[in-house]
A protein has these predicted regions:
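Short, internal active-site loops enriched in acidic
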Residues: 100-105
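Short secondary-structure junctions
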Residues: 86-93, 232
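Helix-start/capping segments and mature chain N-termini
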Residues: 1-72, 76-83, 106-305
Length: 305
């Protein structure tokens, strides 16, 4: 990772090299932290953060679920994000707000510990590589099952949840694949380790419902709105592993990955007739995040003061 200039910590901007925490930080030991991920893109009117308010709303909702009093409002966090981009001077960057139980009492009860809040930014290219945007990725159905919502609140973007994702990711990479696809405890498709998943069959677009134990992704919501506006037939429904194999098109979506085609699942080729619907959605998404479609300009928050 290439260091930038500043990181925001508990209301103050500190130098990148000084953004440190104690080794006995409670959240480091018990996974008691929440985070968000959002992107800033260059646009004709200057850099802008895509769907900033929706990301911060989810961040605050995650805090409520985990009984974290952040001590900062959505407005204060929004301004901190924008000022951080201005100070670091990068028009194309990734933003990572995080809140965690700070140094203090150890043990499983987090309620005695102060909640620390920080925001970092860095330059981050396509999460699954440039080929993911053009040629597509090779995926495998993981042996690791997606966390059950009865065990962990999956709508909260909690760091602890991502240990489950990391196991699936490592398994896929070790087997020579680019990414994993995770099933839930009922054996139906949930999502990728850090992405939602969409399927096209007979020109009908579908994605797993929230009841399958997925994170309600903001890029997922963006694509659903695009599909409605483009008159693409769309459903939220469960899919089996076998239905993945017989898909006409598959793609991942997420803030980090954008929209990435899946060209193969467990050795089965996907997209024999190309990816016409995926390509249309990707083209629109790219135009929207770069401020070239007025209809969706409300989703862009300008960085310029």
């Amino acid at each position: 990772m290439k260091p930038l200039t500043k990181i925001w910590m508990d209301g103050k901007f500190v130098d990148w090299a000084d953004a440190n925490i104690h080794i006995l930080t409670h959240g480091l030991h018990y996974g008691y932290s929440i985070f968000e991920g959002m992107r800033c893109f260059p646009t004709p009117a200057g850099p802008a953060v895509f769907r900033l308010q929706e990301h911060l709303e989810r961040f605050l909702n995650s805090a409520k679920i985990y009984r974290m009093n952040l001590g900062f409002s959505a407005k204060e966090l929004s301004e901190a994000c924008l000022e951080l981009v201005r100070k670091n001077g990068k028009k194309d960057c990734y933003l990572r707000p995080i809140a965690y139980t700070a140094y203090g009492e150890m043990g499983l009860n987090p309620l005695k510990n102060k909640i620390a809040v920080a925001i970092a930014s860095w330059e981050w290219g396509p999460y699954l590589g440039q080929d993911a945007q053009t040629r597509g990725v090779r995926a495998t159905v993981s042996s690791w099952v997606r966390i059950d919502p009865r065990a962990m609140p999956v709508q909260a973007k909690c760091s602890a949840n991502y240990a489950n994702s990391a196991l699936a990711k490592m398994e896929a990479l070790s087997a020579g694949y680019d990414e994993a696809i995770m099933l839930n405890s009922h054996g139906v498709v949930a999502e990728g380790p850090g992405e939602n998943i969409f399927r096209v069959k007979d020109r009908i677009l579908s994605t797993p419902p929230a009841s399958s134990g997925i994170l309600r992704g903001i890029t997922r919501d963006t694509i659903i709105q695009f599909a409605r506006d483009m008159k693409i037939k769309f459903y939220r429904n469960d899919s089996t592993k076998e239905e993945l194999y017989t898909s006409d098109e598959l793609f991942f979506s997420g803030t980090a990955v954008g929209i990435a085609k899946i060209r193969e699942v467990d050795g089965r080729r996907i997209g024999y007739d190309g990816f016409p619907i995926t390509d249309k959605l990707h083209k629109l998404y790219t135009a929207v995040v770069h401020g070239k479609v007025n209809r969706y300009s409300k989703w862009l928050t300008p960085v310029t003061a």
